Structures are given as C-alpha cells and as structure tokens.
Regions:
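Metal-dependent phosphate/diphosphate-handling catalytic cores characterized by acidic Asp/Glu clusters
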Residues: 1-90, 96-106, 127-138
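PIN/NYN-family metal-dependent endoribonuclease catalytic core
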Residues: 124
C-alpha cells in the first residue's frame, strides 16, 4: 500500500478534518482527510490528547493509503469510532501536516479558533485503568 501524501491547504483558514469511518472494534481503523474552511462552520469534534512517545506507531488507512499514527491517537480513534456512522474529527497530529513547517506554524496559530469552532471537544486521557477509576471515584 502506498504512503499517504498530504495535499496543500488553501491559505484562507482552511483545515483538514478526519472523516473516521464507522466500524466495529474488530475492524481496522480507516478514514479520509477532507479539506474544509473554518469560516463555513463545519460540525466536528475536536480531540485533545497527550501525543505520548513517537514510537512505536500503528497503521491507519487514510483514503486507502498507508499512514502511521501514535499509539495514543490510535487508542482515542478506536474508542471514538461509531459502529454505524462516520465521525468528523479534528486531531492536530493527523489533520496538520507535521512535516510542513510553514503549514504547521499557520495551523498552530489557528488552534484556539479550531477548538472554539468545534461542536464538542473530547479530552482523551488514555485507556481505562484502575488509576483512572480511582481518580474519578470521588
């Protein structure tokens, strides 16, 4: 499978959103990155999470092309995926071309606007553990 290549964003407040394909827990994660203009007020959920270590990485199928994402993002997407309908998400590690310094700088400057425009923001703390249960068991 060929490696995913980012296509450039328009300079006027365009962002990428991940259209995460519906699926069961047994199915591999897949989706596509779509370009939208923030000023057109698309309905999406923003994802905030700790990126964690850059290695190891997990496979992600983006527009039928290969992409690798961090374990924390993979875990978050697996838990946010719906069984019967696609989900529109923004996650910086995936929706911003991290290898394009100019784009990354421009998109980081827009992050407060992106989070403000989101229908909801999900904060991913990681997989459930006994420590998490204890923290929320007050």
């Amino acid at each position: 499978m060929k490696q995913y290549q980012y296509s450039p964003l328009a300079p006027n407040r365009q962002i990428r959103l991940l259209k995460l394909c519906a699926g069961t827990e047994a199915e591999k994660l897949s989706g596509e990155l779509v370009h939208v203009f923030l000023d057109e007020k698309p309905s999406f959920t923003a994802l905030s999470y700790a990126w964690g270590d850059s290695q190891p990485r997990k496979a992600f199928c983006c527009s039928n092309l290969k992409m690798e994402i961090g374990l924390s993002l993979h875990s978050a997407l697996r838990n946010l995926r719906q069984p019967t309908c696609d989900t529109l998400l923004w996650a910086g590690a995936l929706c911003i071309n991290q290898h394009d310094i100019s784009e990354r700088s421009q998109q980081v400057r827009m992050m407060s606007d992106i989070y403000a425009a989101a229908f909801a923001t999900v904060i991913w703390l990681g997989e459930e553990s006994s420590d998490v249960k204890m923290a929320f068991g007050w």
